[in-house]
C-alpha cells in the first residue's frame, strides 16, 4: 500500500494528514475552512485517494495559512507515498466539465515543482473563502510534491464551478499519474533513472 502520514506543526497551523494512493475515494476532512473541506472531499473522491485531514489553524486571522499549509502537507504526503516512483505512469491529464465551466489539468510527477495556473475566478469570495487562496493551495502542493501541474480554464463564469472543476480535474489527473503500469513495474519512468 502506498501510504503516507504527515504531522506538520507551526505557530500558525497544526495538521495531521493521511493519504492512501490506492484507496477508494474515502475521506474525513476537517480543516476549519468549509469551502476547502468541500474541495478536498471532491479531490479525494475523483482521485480515488483515501484522505484524512485534521487542521487547527489561525482562521481568526483569515484562511490563508490553513489553506496554504494543507496544500503543503498534501504535497508532502504525495511525495512520501510515491517513494522512488517505480512503475508509475508519471503523467496524467483531464479535461473536466462542471456545468458551464471547463477545466484542463495536466500533471508530471517529475521531481520538479512548478505550477502553471490560469483560472479567472470572477468572485473575490465564495461564502467566506477568498478565491485567490486556490492558487496558494496548489503552489504549496506542487512545491512539496515536487510535481509539475498545469491548471487551465477553458470556459466558465461561475466561481464555485470553476474551482470545483479544478479540484476534481486535478484529482483525476493525479489518479492517472500515480497509477502503476504493469509493463514498467520495476522501472522508474525517466531516462535519468531517477525522479
Predicted regions and their residues:
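Structural preference for solvent-exposed beta-strand-turn elements
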Residues: 1-195
Amino acid at each position: 500500500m502506498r501510504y503516507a502520514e504527515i504531522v506538520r506543526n507551526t505557530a500558525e497551523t497544526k495538521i495531521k494528514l493521511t493519504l492512501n494512493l490506492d484507496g477508494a475515494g474515502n475521506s474525513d476532512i476537517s480543516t476549519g475552512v468549509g469551502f476547502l473541506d468541500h474541495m478536498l472531499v471532491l479531490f479525494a473522491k475523483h482521485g480515488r485517494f483515501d484522505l484524512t485531514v485534521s487542521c487547527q489553524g489561525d482562521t481568526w486571522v483569515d484562511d490563508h495559512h490553513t489553506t496554504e499549509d494543507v496544500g503543503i502537507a498534501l504535497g508532502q504526503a504525495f511525495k512520501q507515498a510515491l517513494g522512488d516512483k517505480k512503475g508509475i505512469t508519471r503523467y496524467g491529464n483531464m479535461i473536466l466539465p462542471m456545468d458551464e465551466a471547463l477545466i484542463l489539468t495536466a500533471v508530471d510527477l517529475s521531481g520538479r515543482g512548478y505550477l502553471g495556473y490560469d483560472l479567472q475566478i470572477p468572485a473575490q469570495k465564495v461564502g467566506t473563502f477568498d478565491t485567490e487562496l486556490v492558487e496558494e493551495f496548489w503552489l504549496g502542493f506542487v512545491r512539496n510534491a515536487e510535481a509539475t501541474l498545469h491548471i487551465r480554464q477553458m470556459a466558465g463564469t461561475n466561481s464555485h464551478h470553476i474551482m470545483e472543476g479544478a479540484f476534481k480535474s486535478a484529482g483525476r489527473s493525479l489518479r492517472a499519474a500515480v497509477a502503476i503500469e504493469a509493463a514498467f513495474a520495476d522501472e522508474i519512468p525517466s531516462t535519468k533513472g531517477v525522479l
